[in-house]
UniProtKB/Swiss-Prot annotation:
This is Elongation factor Ts. Its main location: cytoplasm. The keyword Cytoplasm applies. GO terms for cellular component: cytoplasm. Keywords: Cytoplasm, Elongation factor, Protein biosynthesis. It is found in: Cytoplasm.
């Protein structure tokens, strides 16, 4: 298949590899993005194990807690400027309070629910759109529960560009729970621990690392041992409890949590717009459109 400039650009953003290396990888793999990433990693060109999802949409995340229930949500806007608007800030708080109190199963159900004044949530958002002048979207939310013996860890980074909600079980130390949430915001682990990683993902990583070691010219008899060592680093990159704790590099997150007498069973991390591609207009066309709009 034809390799387009957009495909090369996407692969560069996901791997940090050079343009010519990306083009070759896509050519060798017939345009398969995932196989091209593996190709670059096997050659030692792309070092990142995690794919970097493009973050393009604007908006905020928000966290609301009430007793033993907590909620995290993401509300999208078209521009960062609107996300700082007082009307937008008020809307996200109203939505959070409603969602936590009424506990809809999903966004579709939430939009049909009645909010104050007899309006549906969808109508309430549409009224805000009319006032603010931009499309606003309730993208996602999740409700988390705990017991009296647990603590919520809630953290909003950069005013809500990233939001993390977690539960420290068996401990009521809210400061410790928040420290873990801050770590999750900064490091972005994919899983809580190694047990959560699928066998397929581990085997895929083992194959990539094996080919990488062979391409480096390592003797076959030591490749297996090298691969197991590199797999350990792979787990440290993606598993929260295996990671070095950002607030104390002398201990792992697991050790920090255990020192507080608690356990960590899961977490929710939202980054605004992750996985959403924003339409890319040609800059000259954008200027012309603005000029025409002012006529």
């Amino acid at each position: 298949m034809a390799i387009t400039a957009q495909m090369v650009k996407e692969l560069r953003e996901k791997t940090g590899a050079g343009m010519m290396d990306c083009k070759k990888a896509l050519t060798e793999t017939n345009g398969d993005m995932e196989k091209a990433i593996d190709f670059l990693r096997e050659k030692g060109i792309a070092k990142a194990a995690k794919k970097a999802d493009r973050i393009a949409a604007e908006g905020l995340t928000f966290i609301e807690t009430n007793g033993n229930e907590g909620l995290i949500l993401e509300l999208n806007s078209e521009t960062d400027f609107v996300a700082k608007n007082e009307g937008f800030q008020a809307l996200i708080k109203e939505l959070a309070a409603h969602l936590l109190a009424n506990k809809p199963a999903n966004v579709e159900e939430a939009m049909a629910q009645t909010i104050e004044g007899g309006k549906t949530v969808e109508e309430h958002i549409n009224e805000a759109i009319a006032k603010i002048g931009e499309k606003l979207t309730l993208r996602r939310f999740e409700i988390v529960s705990k017991t009296d013996a647990d603590a919520f860890g809630a953290y909003l980074h950069m005013g809500g560009r990233i939001g993390v909600l977690t539960v420290l079980e068996g401990s009521t130390d809210e400061a410790a729970a928040k420290d873990v949430a801050m770590h999750i915001a900064a490091v972005n682990p994919k899983y809580i621990d190694r047990d959560a990683v699928t066998a397929e993902e581990v085997e895929h990583e083992r194959q990539v690392l094996t080919q990488q070691a062979l391409n480096e010219g390592k003797p076959e008899k030591i490749v297996a041992k090298m691969v197991e060592g590199r797999l350990g680093k792979f787990f440290e990159e993606i598993c929260l409890l295996d990671q070095t704790f950002v607030k104390n590099p002398d201990m792992k997150v697991r050790q920090f949590v255990e020192s507080k007498g608690g356990t960590l069973k899961g977490f929710v991390r939202y980054a605004v717009g992750e996985g959403i591609e924003k339409r890319e207009d040609n800059f000259a066309e954008e200027v012309m459109n603005q000029v025409k709009g002012n006529n």
